[in-house]
From Swiss-Prot:
Domain of life of the organism encoding this protein: Bacteria
GO terms (BP aspect): ATP synthesis coupled electron transport
Enzyme class per UniProt: translocase
Name this protein carries in UniProt: NADH-quinone oxidoreductase subunit K
Catalytic activity: a quinone + NADH + 5 H(+)(in) = a quinol + NAD(+) + 4 H(+)(out)
Quaternary data: NDH-1 is composed of 14 different subunits. Subunits NuoA, H, J, K, L, M, N constitute the membrane sector of the complex.
Length: 101
């Protein structure tokens, strides 16, 4: 049977991969967004694992809310990137600093 330790190990591994994605790739904004989504997925796995371990549904309900917010964040972030790419022709992190606003 798969225990709580296995889920926590998988979640910790995903979180570390997301952290490495943030720190090692500073050029591409899409990879940064994907790394943040990977970290949120690791948090959701932790919430569901502890919720199942404790026999409480609050963690699973909270995970649904986190997934909803993460989907909205990804959609808005990608929409901003598409508009930025149309205006500037690039999505490098260094060029995002020159945005007006």
């Amino acid at each position: 049977m798969i225990g709580l330790e296995h889920y926590l190990t998988v979640a910790a591994t995903l979180f570390v991969i997301g952290i490495f994605g943030l720190f090692l790739n500073r050029k591409n904004v899409i990879v940064l967004l994907m790394s943040i989504e990977l970290m949120l997925l690791a948090v959701n796995i932790n919430l569901v694992a502890f919720s199942s371990f404790l026999g409480d549904l609050v963690g699973q309900v909270f995970t649904l809310f986190v997934l909803t917010v993460a989907a909205a964040e990804a959609a808005i972030g990608l929409a901003i990137l598409v508009c930025f790419f149309r205006n500037r022709g690039t999505i490098d992190v260094e060029d995002v600093n020159v945005m007006k606003g």
